[in-house]
């Protein structure tokens, strides 16, 4: 956990500014075009205890294919990927500038089992799923609006088995 938490601390202290495009429900602070990495980290990163719970779930259930909607800065992605290095993690992020930071963080951790897909889930999820035989574990944490979440869940369900685990985060309907 230590290397990932070091990256979390760096992100929480980063004053670097990004131009972002938010396709989801937006942050609690509202949509803005220019945001500091530390602001994104403060509002979007999963708390350590929840990210580590996901790590333990992956470690226990040993899924082969993991799908994450909502890469953000890559901290939770790092926990998912490091829990089972021989699994494939496909993580999706709407904002190219945020995805770029995530890729850098995942590379820093030398996680080779991750593929980052950039773009609006409405435009990228269907094609991404068409290239996956089945999903063993899905973490839906990207767009928090009701209808898109239901739509994404139903698409993921088509690639699920009776043993698939689907975790939906931040549901506030």
Locate each region found by the language model.
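A short alpha-helical cap/connector motif
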Residues: 1-137, 143-167, 171-173
